[in-house]
């Protein structure tokens, strides 16, 4: 049996191992398409700001081809470094594209104000054609800019600080799109807006340079459909992370946005580890979880073997991502989702509609959290040096906290009795009796004469006698006559409920320190 278990463990490890990268054959190269990336040919801020302005206009043009749009976006993404050409050549390693760099310099003879650097060759016409300045079919909006603030005609500046602020604002909006461009493009607008508000409050971006939704949609769609562009963005993130020492402000902002990008599409795997394993509830000892726990262990080892690109496997369309889907460990995932829903309110918005979702193990996770509330782990207590007395105190506090949390989740309980003021005439008898009348009598604990036995005047006197002295009565409303019998019946029902609640309050002993809290819903059932 021991040999079988060792063989099983070895089999699981080898099954989930990544393929070995060595072999007799060379690297497989696909059919490449050419991507032209314009980069500044000098260190002038005017050249960079003018190039940024032209590329932003070019990106929003709906008639631009895919490779040309990718080249424009790569050019924008690399403008914040001192040598964009060296950066692009260093980090680009895509077997499906061939990147060609075109240096751009200022020109007074072209309509775009830019030209391609060349030795003695006039390239103004080619530059104007690239930036679509001689295309009459180009949209008017692309000529006037794509910012929400239409007063901004261009973004050409002479100041390096101003250029960095404008460039950082545009780059922040592009990088935020990567977070959900692949996994959830339909619901990305809300999260992107929250990121924008955050960076606006931190003064990292300038609110006036907010790009229009159409421009952002074009860029998001291009990021979603173009794998070489995503590979370049991931390679740029990793290159920034590997840079030692202090980084430029834009680079630090990209690293901050990266916290929303990493592990995109791996929520099932990460949350199963967080709520299913790290909580260490005794349910992990079930035999049903033994195989899936072994699977998760192999996946965690595989994740580490993949290195720094593991958190981006979904964005990079790595085929190994299918091994990390919840379908490989459905029972443990269902259990972890039940635990997560009970522990964190943010988990309530997750979509559990999967074919492998098991409601029984989902409820198991919920019950484990509820019944384990206030318990202290003996292992953790011994490691942290918590005494038995401290553990009892923690358990007591945790129990009260859990009860308060559950009561808030059910709904607020009212400290005062609220009742209705109906439009009722005293001359119209209320339609009341039967089962509802018995509820009122039982709640008061005493026999009362019904309205039919006492008549209108005696019933009115009885109601007045049993009403609390501090109960505010709306005399104007009560004296109004109504011709609708349903309104009269509802008014009478409300007054009888008030009698019942008044009787309950009279039965409370005067020695009670805290008054009893009632919920109107209990009396309305």
UniProtKB/Swiss-Prot annotation:
The keyword Cell inner membrane does not apply. A motif (Nuclear localization signal) lies at residues 70-77. Residues 1-403 are annotated as: Ncore. GO terms for molecular function: RNA binding; structural molecule activity. The modification Phosphothreonine is found at residue 279. It is found in: Virion; Host cytoplasm; Host nucleus. Its main location: virion. The keyword Phosphoprotein applies. Belongs to the paramyxoviruses nucleocapsid family. Forms the helical nucleocapsid (NC) in a ratio of 1 N per 6 ribonucleotides, protecting the genome from nucleases. The nucleocapsid (NC) has a helical structure with either 12.35 or 11.64 N per turn, approximately 20 nm in diameter, with a hollow central cavity approximately 5 nm in diameter. The encapsidated genomic RNA serves as template for transcription and replication; encapsidation by N is coupled to RNA synthesis. Forms the encapsidation complex with the phosphoprotein protein P. Before encapsidation, the newly synthesized free N protein, so-called N0, is chaperoned by P. Ncore is globular and carries regions required for N self-assembly and RNA-binding. Ntail is an intrinsically disordered monomeric domain in the C-terminus. Homomultimer; forms the nucleocapsid. Binds to viral genomic RNA. N0 interacts (via Ncore) with the phosphoprotein (via N-terminus); this interaction allows P to chaperon N0 to avoid N polymerization and non-specific RNA binding before encapsidation. Interacts (via the Ntail) as N-RNA template with the phosphoprotein (via C-terminus XD); this interaction maintains the P/L complex anchored to the nucleocapsid template during the sequential transcription. This is Nucleoprotein. It comes from Measles virus (strain IP-3-Ca) (MeV).
């Amino acid at each position: 049996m021991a040999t079988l278990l060792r063989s099983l463990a070895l089999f699981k490890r080898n099954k989930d191992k990544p393929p070995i990268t060595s072999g007799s054959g060379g690297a497989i190269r696909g059919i490449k398409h050419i991507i032209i990336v314009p980069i500044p040919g000098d260190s002038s801020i005017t050249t960079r700001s003018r190039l940024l302005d032209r590329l932003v206009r070019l990106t929003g043009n709906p008639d631009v081809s895919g490779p040309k749009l990718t080249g424009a976006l790569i050019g924008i993404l690399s403008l914040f470094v001192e040598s964009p050409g060296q950066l692009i050549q260093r980090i680009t390693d895509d077997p499906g594209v061939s990147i060609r760099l075109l240096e751009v310099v200022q020109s007074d003879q072209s309509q775009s104000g830019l030209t391609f650097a060349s030795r003695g060759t006039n390239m103004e016409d080619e530059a104007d054609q690239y930036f679509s300045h001689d295309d009459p079919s180009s949209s008017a909006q692309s000529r006037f800019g794509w910012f929400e603030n239409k007063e901004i005609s261009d973004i050409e500046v002479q100041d390096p600080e101003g250029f960095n602020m404008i460039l950082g604002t545009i780059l922040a909006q592009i990088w935020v799109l990567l977070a959900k461009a692949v996994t959830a493009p339909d619901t990305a607008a809300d999260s992107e807006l929250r990121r924008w508000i955050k960076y606006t409050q931190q003064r990292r971006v300038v609110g006036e340079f907010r790009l229009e939704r159409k421009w952002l949609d074009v860029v998001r769609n291009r990021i979603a459909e173009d794998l070489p562009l995503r590979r370049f963005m991931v390679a740029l993130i990793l290159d920034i992370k590997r840079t030692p020492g202090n980084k430029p402000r834009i680079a630090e902002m990209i690293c901050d946005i990266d916290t929303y990008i990493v592990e995109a599409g791996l929520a099932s795997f990460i949350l199963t580890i967080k709520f299913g394993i790290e909580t260490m509830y005794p349910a992990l000892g079930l035999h049903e979880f033994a195989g899936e726990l072994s699977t998760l262990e192999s996946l965690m080892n595989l994740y580490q073997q993949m290195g720094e690109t593991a958190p981006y496997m979904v964005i990079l369309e790595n085929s190994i991502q299918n091994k990390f889907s919840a379908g490989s460990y459905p029972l443990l995932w269902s259990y972890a989702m039940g635990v997560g829903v009970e522990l964190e309110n943010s988990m309530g918005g997750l979509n559990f509609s999967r074919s492998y979702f098991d409601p029984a193990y989902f409820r198991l996770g919920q019950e484990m959290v509820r019944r384990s509330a206030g318990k202290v782990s003996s292992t953790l207590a011994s490691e942290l040096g918590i005494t038995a007395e401290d553990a009892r105190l923690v358990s007591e506090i945790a129990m009260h906290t859990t009860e308060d949390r559950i009561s808030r989740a059910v709904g607020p309980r009212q400290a005062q009795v609220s009742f209705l003021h109906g439009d009722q005439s005293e001359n119209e008898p209320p339609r009341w009796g039967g089962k509802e009348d018995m509820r009122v009598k039982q709640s008061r604990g005493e026999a009362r004469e019904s309205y039919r036995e006492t008549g209108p005047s005696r019933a009115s006197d009885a109601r007045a006698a049993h009403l609390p002295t501090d109960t505010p009565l709306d005399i104007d409303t009560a004296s109004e006559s109504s011709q609708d019998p349903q309104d009269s019946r509802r008014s009478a029902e409300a007054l009888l409920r008030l009698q019942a609640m008044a009787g309950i309050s009279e039965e409370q002993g005067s020695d009670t320190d805290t008054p009893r809290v009632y919920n109107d819903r209990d009396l309305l059932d």
